[in-house]
């Protein structure tokens, strides 16, 4: 788990849960294939779920918004990367997510409530092989 900072240091306008509603590279048809596409930004134990990506985030405020590093799994493949978000005039956030040595996409998210079910931990290859036997 990546841990960021105390709640007092995290900008209130970004703090909370956000529902990802658009993605430039991967489209929007399958955005919820692993469950509702979400990003949490609180400065502590933050998560990302989009398509088949499950990841832990480490968020840091910047002058322009919030930047983050992340690590997790794309299906069962370990992946990591970076990203950033900025608040728009309409109250949504615009973001960018980049997979290390891979693709990059922009996204749009709107504020939402914390999900009833937590975002699961990213799976590992061990989990993949357990399911086959």
Question: What spans do the regions from the language model cover?
Answer:
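A short, hydrophobic secondary-structure junction motif
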Residues: 37-49, 89-92, 128-133
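Short beta-strand segments that buttress and anchor functional surface loops
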Residues: 47-52, 67-74, 95-98
């Amino acid at each position: 788990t990546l841990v960021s900072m105390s709640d007092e240091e995290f900008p209130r306008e970004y703090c909370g849960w956000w529902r990802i509603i658009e993605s430039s590279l991967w489209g929007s048809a399958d955005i919820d294939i692993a469950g509702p596409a979400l990003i949490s930004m609180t400065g502590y134990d933050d998560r990302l779920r989009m398509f088949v990506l499950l990841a832990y985030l480490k968020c840091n405020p910047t002058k322009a918004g919030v930047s983050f590093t992340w690590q997790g799994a794309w299906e069962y493949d370990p992946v990591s990367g970076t990203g950033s978000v900025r608040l728009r005039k309409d109250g949504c956030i615009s973001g960018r997510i980049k997979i290390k040595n891979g693709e990059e996409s922009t996204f749009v998210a709107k504020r939402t409530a914390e999900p009833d079910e937590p975002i699961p931990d990213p799976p590992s290859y061990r989990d993949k092989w357990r399911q086959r036997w």
